[in-house]
Amino acid sequence: MNSVLIPRVRFACKLTFAILGALVLGFYLQLETPRWSAMTAAIVTSGPALAAGGEPFAGAIRHRGFLRVIGTFIGCIAALVIVIATARAPVVMLLLCCIWAGVCTWWSSLVRIENSYALGLAGYTALIIVVTSASSPLQTPQFAVERCSEIVIGICCAIVADLLFSPRSIKKDIDRAVSQLMLDQFALMRICVNSGTKEEIDKSWNNLVKSTTALNGMRGSLMMESSRWQRCNRRLKALHSTSLSMITQACETYLIMQSSPERVSPELKALFAEPAENVADVHRRLKQLRQMITGMHSDNVLMTVSAWTGAGTRALLLMKGIQTNSSISAIESGVLDGEVVVRPVSAERHHALVNGLRTFTATTIGCLMWLWTGWTSASGCVIIIAVVTSLAMRTPNPKGMAMDFIIGMLLAIPVGSMMFMLIMPATQQSLFLLCLMLGIFTFFIGIEVTKRRLGMLGLLAGTINILVLSNPMVFNVTSFLDNAMGQAIGTVIAMAVLLIVRDKSREKTGRTLLNRFMSSAVSALTTKAYRRRENHLPALYHQLNQLLVMFPNDIGKYRLALMLIIAHQRMKLAEVPVNDELSAFHKKIRNTADHVVSASGEGKRTYYYQRLLKELGEYQEKLVEYDAPLKVTEPVRRLTDMLQRYQHAFLA
């Protein structure tokens, strides 16, 4: 009980300190709108907690704060450029802001998720500044400077609060995860060698892929904590690739055992007879495997088992370095510098385009409503629309995030009304009483945010926004209710646009991912040494994880993707005869595979796919002509048969 309650109370204190510190500092520096600094502190502090479902690890708040500063400065510069260029045409000015917000949302959907926050923020910051200064364009530079000042103050307060209230380090969690990873790797190989059921294999490798991906995500959080983890970061990056390699080799062993169970000797099987109890047990078994493999003839040892043993040995070496954070030895240096990791290319281009279109459409509707009705609070409505659509588009569940804002903004009306009409007038302009009232409210909201309670983040931001905190405080009830209704209507409009502009890119993205798996397997055929050093496994498993998220119940897609990853790894290790004609054929096959991936219509895709199958058939004949060994011809034949058998999955 205490282990759960203490982090929640600590985070609630952190959130309260950050918001109150930003508010008091804003009043002290006589900022125009000190509530923006308080809102910044609230969003920067509570956002990572909502995503983590608890107190965020050390560094997460600082990283988010720096991204917010970058996004704010980019948005301010964009706003100044738009106003200077179109100050005499207000409609064009607002239209350009809507286009800018849509472009930023589109771009944020294509880049890495941890960096997309800055782009999303840049989109709606420009809109906020332009809308705020619409009545007096000459004051736009002043609004931009004030906006940046408020953001920086809010972020500084959030960082100070994060440092004061014992930020939780992720290092211990990484050490535990690394140890468990080695046990899970041995468990998967044990199931594969002993020819377990497909259900056991699917469950084991699925969990192992998820834990490997999670460990790589922890690596980013660790680097946010301190620069002293640089060595640990390098080892974790190498361990990620090594772990994926071990998963691939274990699954290939299973496929080989299904057709040729005699390929693994009884002596080797005996070492996988019993499960490993701890890391020391895994270390002992790997040592026995190395000794046994060394004493056997290479033709009698399955290549995947030998490669898995070597990768496991490297993983244990990296694990020890991760847990001690010691200096990198010469042996480790060879492991760390062995391969060049290739970054994945986004397959969600159509999805990103839909996200940008949603943001543009929603903000345009808000601006048109503002221009048509002349509603005094329509500007606040437009701002909320931009904020909700920009932030929601970056999440795996945009509708869920939008619903969180709707519930929060609706709850903010009664909660904010009680605070504005009853509690705040009773404070009699006392800053201490105001901070006490807001502190109690923020503390309980902070506890609920760590529980991922629906609507709490929206309630916190919405309440701070509609209170319009100023010094001295002006209690205009009509203006308050107008602002409250404006932000509530804005969230409803944003949700309506999300429902109307549907994202139908799921099937297209899934087919693109499968075609990229196919292309990577075919492209692994090479005689070039530099191409063999390229490590595509992290990118391939990243795309496999996307398939897991998009098609959680389609096990057939996972198995097909995994077989293509195995084919890629086998092709990469194949010793293709060095020959100019074969090298030219490799280039030709890669070019055709790229056309299959990039083909826009079904007709073109089918044409290039059939051409690829024909070229692979000709390539097999060339391999026989140049006396290629069975270790080369057999993987090519298996890949060709697989592409022939499952061509409906790549073309449908």
From Swiss-Prot:
Keyword Transmembrane: yes
One biological process term in Gene Ontology: carboxylic acid transport
Major subcellular location class: membrane
Family matches, as InterPro entries: PHBA_efflux_AaeB/fusaric-R, PHBA_efflux_pump_AaeB
Membrane-traversing stretches: 11-31, 41-61, 65-85, 91-111, 118-138, 368-388, 405-425, 430-450, 455-475, 480-500
Recorded GO CC terms: plasma membrane
Source species, domain of life: Bacteria
Membrane topology, record value: Multi-pass membrane protein
Subcellular location: Cell inner membrane
Signal peptide: none
GO molecular function, one term: transmembrane transporter activity
Keyword vocabulary terms for this entry: Cell inner membrane, Cell membrane, Membrane, Transmembrane, Transmembrane helix, Transport
Chain's role: Forms an efflux pump with AaeA. Could function as a metabolic relief valve, allowing to eliminate certain compounds when they accumulate to high levels in the cell.
Family per similarity comment: Belongs to the aromatic acid exporter ArAE (TC 2.A.85) family.
Name this polypeptide is given: p-hydroxybenzoic acid efflux pump subunit AaeB
Organism: Rahnella sp. (strain Y9602)
Lineage, top ranks: Bacteria, Pseudomonadati, Pseudomonadota, Gammaproteobacteria, Enterobacterales
Name of the gene this protein is made from: aaeB
